[in-house]
Amino acid sequence: MKRILLPLEDTERSLKAIHYVKKHYPPEDAELVLMMVDESLGYSVKSEAENQALKELDEKLETIAQSLEDYKVNTVSAVGKAGVRIARTARETGSNVIVMTKSSKEDMLSSIGTTAEYVINNAPCDVVIVSEAANSKNEYRGLVYR
C-alpha cells in the first residue's frame, strides 16, 4: 500500500492534487496523509496564535478528509516554512510519494515555485507535480521528479 502525502492550501488549484490521486490510486492501494502549513507565523515558541492557526488548519483538513471517505486518511497541520515541513512530514510518515501542485501565485504560472522546488530537492521519495493545464480529454498531466 502506498502512503501518499498531499500538501494542500486554500486554493482551488490545490484540490487538483486530490483529483489526481483519486484517478491514479484506488482506495484499496493508498493511504493518504493530508497536510496544511501556515507560513504566516514562522518558527516561534508555541503561542496562542499558533494553537489557533493549527486548530483552523485541522478543521479544514477534517472537512477535506470527509470527502475522501473511501480512503484511509491521516491529517497533519504545521506552522513554519512549507517546503521544510512537507519534506520533514514525508520522512516522518514514511510517505512513498508526494503529490502537489506548483506555485499558487498568479505571477508564477510558468514556474513551479520555491516550495515545490524545495520539496523536489529535499524529499525522501518521489514527487508528482500536478499540472494545472488539462489536455483535450480533461485529464491531468503531471511530472514525476527523482
Predicted regions and their residues:
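Intrinsically disordered or low-complexity boundary/linker segments at protein termini
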Residues: 1-16, 122-146
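Short, well-ordered secondary-structure micro-motifs
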Residues: 17, 44-50, 87-88, 110-111, ...
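General small-molecule cofactor/ligand-binding pocket signal
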Residues: 33-35, 74-78, 128-130
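Glycine-rich, Arg-bearing micro-motifs that act as flexible, cationic patches
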Residues: 100-122, 132, 136-138
